[in-house]
Amino acid sequence: MSGTLEVVRPGPLTTVQDLGRPGHAHLGVPRSGAVDRDSLKLANRLVGNEEGAAALEATLSGPALRFEEATVVAVTGVVAPVSVDGEDLEVNAAIDVPAGAVLDVGTAAAGLRPYVAVRGGIASEPVLGSRSRDTLSALGPEPLAKGDRLAIGEPAGPRPAVAVAPVAPPGSDAVVRVTPGPRADWFGPDALKLLAGEAWTVSPESNRSGTRLDGTPLPRLRQDELRSEGMVEGAIQVRHSGLPMVLLADHPTTGGYPVIAVVVAEDLPKIAQARPGQEVRFRDA
């Protein structure tokens, strides 16, 4: 262990996340892990961690953290105010934090989920091979609370020479590529045209299990019920209401709603960072 951090302000649903625990779907346990894996990997690279090291994922507004020992951190995924002891700093950059200083990540102006990586990684106890919090199965460390103290691991390698990553900020709308789902025929031969023809709006009821979308309900050709079948991250289920939901990291491993399409894996970060009220459009890949 190379130090400890204290939670001064947890921020909304701030959890420890890494790249998840794949391979346990047969036990009913989803992969979990960071919803926006690209941002997690970038934050870890900036501080010299392995890409899959455990970091912190928040929702809309980030945490305030006091570090007992000097360290290096990076904040990615969003455009947000970041400061150390009141000094304004940048996102997508390596930040030196002196011993005893407080890192403060404010409310995001763009994007939804900030990621905070610490050199050495968060050294919480692994569960089924991962340090991630699974909000569906309640596995892994609890979401952060004021006064919590988290152990920081030993650095895995030298600090990178590149300290800044020129990353485009999250857009105000998201165009997401999809492929046909296994139950697209439940919506007729033009299922993807129906899906792509609507400007969907992200619902405030969205969470780490899935992004719910509001808009014009999709008509179903079949009204009978579907037996539960295996689900994957990025699957677009159509609920009884006719409204779609994109499954995310903490999704149930089975489900009975028909899957009209599946989001291309490379575009999942766009869904992960889409804020309530933001517009999402789908495009046939």
For each feature predicted by the language model, list its residue ranges.
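Conserved "landmark" site that anchors the functional core of diverse proteins
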Residues: 1-285
